[in-house]
A protein has these predicted regions:
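Extracellular beta-strand/beta-solenoid scaffold signature
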Residues: 1, 23-52, 64-80, 84, ...
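Repeated loop/turn-to-beta-strand initiation elements of outer-membrane beta-barrel proteins
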Residues: 19, 66, 110, 143-144
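Core solenoid repeat modules with strong leucine/isoleucine-rich periodicity
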Residues: 118-134, 138-142, 146-155, 162-164, ...
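Short, solvent-exposed beta-strand-terminating loops
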Residues: 5, 18-25
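Flexible loop/turn segments at secondary-structure boundaries
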Residues: 79, 110-111, 143, 153, ...
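Extended surface/linker regions that mediate inter-domain or inter-protein docking
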Residues: 14-16, 41, 62
Length: 200
């Protein structure tokens, strides 16, 4: 679509037994990065004139899903398309996924706040899932990730961390007041070589 798609709220739902895709090595737009138990996307590429605005995903219980828990992105995979505005992922509980817990992409100043993510990747496999993290951002600017708890994230080939700043992370990314424990890959993965106290 053209223009700004605004005012989407997904709140106070229980979402479970979603049989999505958890394979990483699938063709583009068919892999685990293009679906989710809660999946909000924009067809094609975004711009200052064409993007998502005012997206709220809050207070949901998402569990036992074969795919990721929550995902926000655009359909085309371009790391410089950072245009979605006022995206909030808050107060969700995510347990036992087939891949990642939460991924937010293509957003300006997204807020990821007060979520619980346990056992990300519990329903995945080494052959299919390969690389995951609990909560992470990519192609974002000035993301704020705070007051989240992430535990028992699986590690397959690599990664397996609670948090991740991945490709296209720009501006200043802030992690504060989060609690990470018992994740097979540790606390945080940085794919962007960010500078401490400047970029993150």
């Amino acid at each position: 679509p053209e223009g700004i798609t605004a005012g989407i709220e997904i709140s106070d739902c229980e979402i479970f037994e979603v049989d999505g895709e958890n394979r990483r090595a699938m063709p583009a737009y068919q892999s685990m990065y293009w679906n989710g138990a809660v999946y909000v996307t924009f067809p094609g590429r975004t711009s200052a004139q064409d993007h998502l605005h005012d997206i709220v995903i809050s207070n949901n219980y998402i569990h036992d899903v074969r795919t990721s828990g929550i995902r926000v992105n655009q359909q085309e995979d371009f790391i410089n398309d950072i245009h979605h505005t006022h995206v909030v992922v808050r107060g969700n509980r995510i347990e036992r996924t087939g891949s990642d817990g939460v991924i937010v992409a293509n957003c300006i100043s997204p807020l990821i706040d007060s979520n619980v993510c346990f056992d990300a990747g519990a329903l995945g496999t080494l052959e299919d899932t390969q690389l995951i993290a609990g909560i992470w951002v990519c192609a974002t600017r000035d993301a704020l990730i705070q007051r989240n708890e992430v535990a028992r994230t699986r590690m397959f080939e690599n990664d397996g961390t609670a948090f991740d700043t991945d490709w296209g992370t720009a501006g200043t990314t802030v992690f504060q007041y989060n609690y990470s424990h018992d994740n097979e890959g540790g606390f945080w993965l940085d794919c962007m070589k960010l500078n401490h106290n400047r970029d993150c």
